[in-house]
Amino acid sequence: MCIRGSRGILHRIAGKDVAGGGGSFATISPVDKSTICEVARGDAGDIDKAAKAAKAAFPTWRDMPTKERKAILIRIAEGIEARAEEIALCECWDTGQAWRFMSKAAIRGAENFRYFADQVGAARDGQHLQSPTLMNITTRVPIGPVGVITPWNTPFMLSTWKIAPALAAGCTVVH
């Protein structure tokens, strides 16, 4: 069902899977009270490492040609679509939400990445504020690493609402 490493769900920091400095905790399904798996429990040191990794990656991501950044976001959307059923099943099991909601939420996650992929080119030009009678000048620049916190009720889809626009704008993300 849900794909995970033999050591449970780990943190991904600087492209590597790492255990949490705070040990781990069991994630329990509200559906049947079964243990789904062990999840890395992060601590302040883990957050600091993730923030430093995001800061180090920021210049490369920020300066990437928009065409390349858009292509990456579209590949993410395609990956979500390819695994939408698995994502929905995991979300049902993890949150207790009904299939009819989670199956749509998984697809919506892909749609969020596609939408923001289409916004990559306009992320810096300010042209969304066009007016026939006024001159609008907007300077948009990526601000750096963005910290994202996701609520528990629809975590996958709500994560995409936050991660996709940040990546499209040229920011890196700690989630």
Regions found by a protein language model. Name each.
Residues 15, 42, 96, 144-147, ...:
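Glycine-centered flexibility sites
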Residues 28, 44-47, 156:
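A short local loop/turn or secondary-structure capping micro-motif enriched for an aromatic residue
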